[in-house]
Amino acid sequence: MAANYWASTQRRHWLFTKERLADIRESFRERDKAAHSQFPLPDQRLLNIYFSQQLIKLGKRMSTRQQALATAQVYIKRFYTKNEIRHTNPYLVVTTAFYLACKMEECPQHIRFVVAEARNFWPEFIAPDVSKLGECEFALISEMNSQLIVHHPYRTLSELQPELSLTSDEVALAWSVINDHYLTDLPLLYPPHVIAVMAIIVAVVFKPSQTSFHGTAAPLAGAMRDGGMNILAALGDKNGAGPPPRIQKLVGWLAESEVDIRAVIECTQELVSLYEIWENYSEKHCKELLGRMVKSKNLDK
């Protein structure tokens, strides 16, 4: 809960309501129904998974810190609140967001190196001319009004670890949940401290094993849905038998904190939806649809 978040451009300019985001996306569809009909794309969350996987590939080749990858994902989300994806080359946007995020998170990479590595993965979509990335960087900065500082939930997680006596396994699981929330609209909807608290609840209450965290997404989603309602019930019932002491401590802390409990539950439900739809994810399908769109509209030029 970094104090400077409350005065940040992130809080003042880059938090939306669900209704506002839906209106933005609907306006894109209304303005260009032909493109939406000609180039159907998967659910936004499935695209987010695909973009995240591409960023991870790029980041691994350059030993990039997770926070830079997270910042890149936020940049992509912000950019696409101003631009219809069907009028862009998403591979260039992903590469540019990565390049810019590395600079902002103080782990800069040379532009020629970034372009070369991106071409190793997507040679048909990334031109060898580095000026293309430079132009896209200018557009990205302009669309975000030069508001490039991103506050992440990782810091709050670290701050709450001793206060809530979180084990190393719980911290690792909460970290994974925070990573996953970037695959949803949550970074555009809620403050980072709310996301961090949600991640801690998932780690402490549901304790999904890391090996099956995504492999059994549907059962996990059901467990999380039930668990989320149990937490809500516990907060409203101070006299019942209640949950185990470990969870009681967390519930007690939540009840006494100034954290918006309803927002935490809504974030948990959004994560449930992500894990449910994850079962339908196909990297090949996303790649084919995006590739057809980029090539047909000559967006790779």
Curated annotation (Swiss-Prot):
Similarity comment: family membership: Belongs to the cyclin family. Cyclin C subfamily.
Alphabetical UniProt keywords: Activator, Cyclin, Nucleus, Repressor, Transcription, Transcription regulation
Any GO MF annotation of the entry: cyclin-dependent protein serine/threonine kinase regulator activity
InterPro entries linked: Cyclin-like_dom, Cyclin-like_sf, Cyclin/Ssn8, Cyclin_N
Known partners and oligomeric status: Component of the srb8-11 complex, a regulatory module of the Mediator complex.
Lineage: Eukaryota, Fungi, Dikarya, Ascomycota, Pezizomycotina
Keyword Plastid: no
Residue stretches making up the Cyclin N-terminal domain: 53-142
Protein name, as recorded: RNA polymerase II holoenzyme cyclin-like subunit
Pfam name, any one: Cyclin_N
Coiled-coil boundaries: none
CDD domains: CYCLIN_CCNC_rpt1 (cd20513)
GO cellular component, one term: nucleus
GO biological process, one term: regulation of transcription by RNA polymerase II
Entry annotated with the keyword Transcription regulation: yes
Location of this chain's protein in the cell: Nucleus
Source species of the chain: Aspergillus oryzae (strain ATCC 42149 / RIB 40)
Function, in words: Component of the srb8-11 complex. The srb8-11 complex is a regulatory module of the Mediator complex which is itself involved in regulation of basal and activated RNA polymerase II-dependent transcription. The srb8-11 complex may be involved in the transcriptional repression of a subset of genes regulated by Mediator. It may inhibit the association of the Mediator complex with RNA polymerase II to form the holoenzyme complex. The srb8-11 complex phosphorylates the C-terminal domain (CTD) of the largest subunit of RNA polymerase II.
SUPFAM superfamilies, per database record: Cyclin-like (SSF47954)
